[in-house]
């Protein structure tokens, strides 16, 4: 599992590690790891290094000595010659690096202007060099993080560098995993410098293909039956949006619950049972609900009905417009950016600029887990701890995919998983199913549902491959 930590957490871990090794040794670890990561860079015979003040620039300068030893030509652009890392500059120059006034279009660019301690945004010469990168498009590698990003907030609305590759040290940062900042990082490579024993619990985690053990809690007991596996209630669709009911049920069928109860109009219930005879269209006890996908005029009543059962509930789509002020039962809210904007009474653009901030605000406001759907779906607990999904394909931006996701996660909830774990695993497996359904090409929501059972089996067996989005190296 990938994990990310805040700047404060990283600073404390670095202090503890440096107390054991010394700061010089720690910088040398980072420098060597950076140089090794640069060995296969396109146009790697020449590199221009944008050198800022402090340790970030020092890491790059010491890495330059390794590159020079390997026959690479290194040009140094000093952002502030009076504040440059003196020992690093001396070592680079003694090995053959040359100082130049401005970057050129030769080779690739190493962004070492600012690290994790800097404020978001760039000014003056740093902003000019970032604009030069945007204009000239050299292959750009960021040292630890691209300069100008909001590291802890994972935003990128101020002036910043956009990198093709980010070589980050010790642990991932929120900005390297969460959009929109992550989109400015390109591919991300982690260099181990020994921080692990000194890091606290992460604020962000990412499920990976080999994390199948996380789903073991949802496996059926050998002596169990359909009721012990869990019953999920589906209240989805309407006469106008009948397809949402079918797709939500299809997602639930692909999950881990032993039985599905469907609640809807008589006409819709007949359609659902006619298509899926395993479904029971009668009220009865359930262990979890999925409510709202394609809902009609009765959705407010269905919200009340589901909450009255005092079992975990997933609220999607139109159900999000009828939420009480808080909950006393486990709840998972699954908005997209527009729905979250409506819930919080802000513009959609505000959510898209700072999705993590707004997802955390909603989780705290409703004391519920929030799954914010997007290219990198976020799952956020009320305490702010977060899971980021990196599986999937842009082809999953298709009608009905969210209905399948709601039913599938509802099934996981009915098995006993928490809203956070059900949302995190559900998003990951749903994304993987989108890839498996038609690798590299378009998929329909029904095809995603059909692919899910085999994806779940592969996940449990540790055999999932090719599920990653770009930017996850």
PLM regions: where:
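Nucleotide and nucleotide-moiety/phosphate-recognizing core
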Residues: 35-113, 121-143
């Amino acid at each position: 599992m990938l994990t990310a930590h805040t700047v404060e957490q990283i600073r404390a871990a670095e202090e503890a590690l440096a107390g054991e090794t010394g700061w010089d040794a720690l910088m040398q670890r980072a420098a060597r790891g950076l140089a090794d990561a640069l060995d296969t860079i396109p146009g790697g015979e020449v590199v221009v290094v944008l050198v800022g003040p402090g340790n970030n620039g020092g890491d790059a300068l010491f890495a330059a000595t390794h590159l020079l030893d390997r026959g690479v030509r290194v040009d140094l652009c000093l952002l502030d010659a009076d504040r440059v890392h003196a020992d690093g500059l001396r070592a680079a120059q003694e090995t053959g690096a040359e100082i130049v006034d401005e970057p050129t279009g030769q080779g690739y660019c190493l962004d070492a202007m600012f690290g994790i301690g800097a404020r978001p945004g760039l000014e003056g010469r740093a902003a000019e060099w970032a604009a030069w990168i945007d204009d000239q498009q050299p292959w750009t590698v960021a040292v630890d993080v691209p300069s100008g990003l909001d590291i802890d907030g994972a935003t990128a609305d101020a002036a910043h560098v956009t990198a093709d590759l980010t070589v980050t040290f010790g642990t991932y940062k929120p900005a390297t995993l969460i959009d929109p900042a992550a989109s400015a990082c390109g591919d991300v490579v982690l260099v181990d410098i020994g921080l692990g024993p000194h890091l606290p619990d992460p604020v962000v985690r990412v499920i990976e293909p080999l994390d199948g053990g996380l789903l073991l809690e949802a496996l059926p007991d050998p002596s169990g039956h359909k009721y012990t596996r869990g019953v999920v209630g589906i209240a989805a669709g309407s006469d106008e949006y009948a397809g949402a009911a079918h797709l939500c049920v299809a997602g639930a069928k692909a999950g881990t619950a032993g039985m599905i109860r469907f609640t809807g109009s008589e006409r819709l219930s007949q359609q659902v049972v006619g298509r899926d005879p395993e479904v029971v269209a009668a009220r009865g006890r359930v262990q979890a609900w999925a409510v709202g996908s394609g809902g009609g005029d009765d959705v407010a009543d269905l919200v009340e009905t589901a909450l009255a059962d005092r079992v975990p509930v997933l609220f999607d789509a139109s159900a999000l417009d009828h939420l009480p002020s808080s909950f006393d039962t486990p709840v998972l809210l699954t908005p997209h950016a527009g729905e979250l904007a409506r819930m919080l009474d802000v513009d959609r653009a505000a959510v898209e600029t700072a999705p993590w901030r707004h997802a955390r605000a909603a989780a705290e406001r409703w004391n519920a887990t929030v799954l914010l759907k997007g290219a990198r779906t976020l799952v956020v607990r009320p305490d702010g701890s977060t899971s980021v999904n990196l599986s999937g394909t842009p082809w999953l931006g298709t009608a009905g995919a969210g209905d399948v996701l709601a039913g599938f996660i509802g099934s996981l909830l009915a098995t006993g998983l928490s809203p956070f774990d059900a949302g995190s695993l559900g998003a990951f497996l749903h994304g993987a199913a989108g890839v498996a359904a038609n690798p590299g090409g378009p998929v329909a929501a029904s095809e995603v549902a059909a692919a899910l059972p085999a994806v779940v089996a592969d996940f449990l067996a540790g055999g999932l491959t090719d599920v990653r989005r770009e930017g996850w190296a």
